[in-house]
A protein has these predicted regions:
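Short arginine-rich
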Residues: 87-105
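Short aromatic-glycine-(Arg/Gly/Cys) micro-motifs in beta-strand/loop hairpins
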Residues: 41-74, 85-91
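Extended acidic low-complexity intrinsically disordered regions
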Residues: 1-7, 12, 104-117
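Compositionally biased, intrinsically disordered low-complexity regions enriched in proline and serine
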Residues: 11, 19, 67-68, 91, ...
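Short N-terminal "domain-start" leader segments
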Residues: 1-58
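Conserved aromatic
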Residues: 75-79
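N-terminal functional modules and adjacent low-complexity/disordered segments of proteins
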Residues: 7, 33, 42, 71, ...
């Protein structure tokens, strides 16, 4: 994600956001991370509820998967920070998987896309 200033992020996630399984939802949208957060006793941890094999996980399954694999999207000091990050992540993933990938890449590169070609 381009700009996470002010979110108090403790640890960047360790999941490749651009190689996620794509799950078709009942409304026709695509889910790749479908995140949630929980407090692990130290930080608010944002985790996906879409498994690496493309299954939609219940909250308990997602938390169990985190403890089993150690994979997470981000760690934060507060629920509010985690929620703001999850919202930004959802919007970025939506643009990447459902929108114009060139526009998405251009935003990530800070508007330098046209200069590359």
């Amino acid at each position: 994600m381009k700009d996470n200033r002010g979110l108090g992020q403790y640890g960047l996630g360790n999941i490749d956001l651009y190689a996620r399984p794509q799950v078709k939802m009942p409304d026709g949208s695509i889910a790749t991370v479908r995140s949630m957060s929980f407090n692990d006793g130290l930080k608010e941890v944002v985790i996906p509820t879409v498994s690496d094999d493309g299954r939609i996980l219940e909250p308990k399954q997602a938390i169990d998967n985190y403890y089993k694999t150690g994979k997470y999207l981000g760690k934060f000091d507060t629920v509010d920070e985690a929620t703001k990050y999850a919202d930004r992540l959802h919007n970025e993933q939506d643009r990447y998987y459902n929108g114009n990938k060139a526009s998405f890449i251009n935003r990530l590169l800070g508007g330098k896309w046209k200069k590359l070609f």
